[in-house]
């Protein structure tokens, strides 16, 4: 597991760590100070994940703007 202030290697790693933190917090077995530390790390991971998603969305927009014939459409999983 990465150090507490270290950014995870990937979006998927951050998401996995965030899920583990949520599980530990939901168990209710953590002492208050440890729960606060875990919550703080979770907020940090969530923000990093959101930033990575925004960067990916910007890259997609740039790629689509290079091809003027293609227009961005909202993703709907039902179209698979």
Curated annotation (Swiss-Prot):
Reaction(s) the record says it catalyses: Exonucleolytic cleavage in either 5'- to 3'- or 3'- to 5'-direction to yield nucleoside 5'-phosphates
Q: InterPro entries under this entry?
A: Exonuc_VII_S (IPR003761), Exonuc_VII_ssu_sf (IPR037004)
Chief location category: cytoplasm
Localization of this protein: Cytoplasm
Q: What class of enzyme is it?
A: hydrolase
Q: Does the keyword Cytoplasm apply?
A: yes
Q: Which GO terms describe its molecular function?
A: exodeoxyribonuclease VII activity
Question: A GO term (biological process) for this protein?
Answer: DNA catabolic process
- One cellular component GO annotation, for this chain's record? exodeoxyribonuclease VII complex
* EC number(s) given by UniProt: 3.1.11.6
* Record keywords: Cytoplasm, Exonuclease, Hydrolase, Nuclease
Q: Does the keyword Nuclease apply?
A: yes
**Superkingdom assignment:** Bacteria
Pfam families under this entry? Exonuc_VII_S
What role is this protein assigned? Bidirectionally degrades single-stranded DNA into large acid-insoluble oligonucleotides, which are then degraded further into small acid-soluble oligonucleotides.
What does the similarity note say?
Belongs to the XseB family.
Quaternary data: Heterooligomer composed of large and small subunits.
According to UniProt, the name of this protein is Exodeoxyribonuclease 7 small subunit
- Protein's organism: Citrobacter koseri (strain ATCC BAA-895 / CDC 4225-83 / SGSC4696)
Gene transcribed to yield this protein = xseB
